[in-house]
Amino acid sequence: MKILFHFTITLFVLSLVACNQIKSPEPVKQYAFIGGKEGDKIDTTCFDSLQLSDPFILADEETQMYYLVGSGGSLWKSTNLKMWTGPYQYITVDTTSWIGTAPRIWAPELHKYKDKYYCFVTFTNPKIIVDTVPNRYNVQRRATHILTSDKVAGPYHPISDKNYLPEGWSTLDGSFWEEDGVPYMVFCHEWMQTVNGIINYIQLAPDLSESM
């Protein structure tokens, strides 16, 4: 009887240990288009009829076209810089990440680097507060992220889940810079958090997947 009792207790303890060692499954990533307006009619219009903040134009030699992006997350195409066709959605993200399903999309830039295309874009999730400046501002989660695509018109997706900058910093307006074969991201540490805004830079990995 004692042997059976000890054997039962041993099995029970081993079961508890095994249960504690089983890791909870990681949430399933859910990639989706964000920005722009799904279902928008694709049309061609003259440049002076477009309403867009923080515009950026990439002249792509491979397709012999110009690509215009700006805050809001839409893309337009043109062959002559006068007439533009769009808007197209081109940004996809994991909506289970901190970015969420409806982030603010600011100041995107498209760059070609080593035969791939990259989108430097600032996301803001107003539901996440990372800092508080007394009598001034509740600092929302805001950061520049780098997305990539094999095609200039996308879809673009995050290179990795890694943060390029501390998540407690409110950063924006990231831009690409290369010097002596070394890639960098130039960015702004926002004045709403620092009082005096700071323009800074970080060195990037050769594939732009993380900061060095």
Regions found by a protein language model. Name each.
Residues 19-212:
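Carbohydrate-active catalytic/glycan-binding domains of CAZyme proteins
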Residues 1-28:
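Bacterial Sec-dependent N-terminal signal peptides
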